[in-house]
Amino acid sequence: MWGGRAGALLRVWGLWPAGVLGRRPLSCNAASLAGSNPSGCWNCGSPGGPVRGDGFFCPQCRALQPPDLTRDYFSLMDCNRSFRVDTAKLQQRYQQLQRLVHPDFFSQRSQTEKDFSEKHSTLVNDAYKTLLAPLSRGLYLLKLRGVEIPEGTDYEMDRQFLMEIMEMNEKLAEAQSEAAMKEIESVVRVKQKELTDNVSRAFERDDFEKAKEILTKMRYFSNVEEKIKLKKIPV
């Protein structure tokens, strides 16, 4: 199959898309900070149940509680589970959470709380980065729906698309000036914008197979973007 041969060439060139790990815009509100502590507070033994306020601290002794690993990134960052995200509000939420759980604020607390703080901060960072970029957001949203894109396959990409990627790679390999690389960057940026709009519509229709196809293409172009960045770094 031609696609298989093209895939082999893409692997040789290092252009195989690497894995990446994010409707209505998100809304940030105080209610989203509520959580639960079903097993009770580790510090004072306060019984579990609904936790008022920020949801990260025991309402009785105010000890930082362990992260809720069952909570998905959209819930943590107070977003609707949607591809459409208000990135300004997402950033506000990120800053809000880091002001609550960043390790710098726990230097004088118990070792247990220091450890929990590290875990909370890492989780918030991962959630923010994932939902900020359209590609990783889309892949994560698919994963929540039980749909994943296998690594190391061309996912039945059509011949025309694979030819486009290979030609772009050839141009990048031949590019000897910053202007030439900027031209390729511009083309990729336009392609990614178009694909982002298309995948947004696919998610709105709950057409996850179409979203999967589009995100695979976005992953190819993202790989090209990384190659451009590497080529710009002085040796």
Task: Describe each region flagged by the PLM.
Residues 2-235:
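C-terminal accessory/regulatory regions appended to core domains
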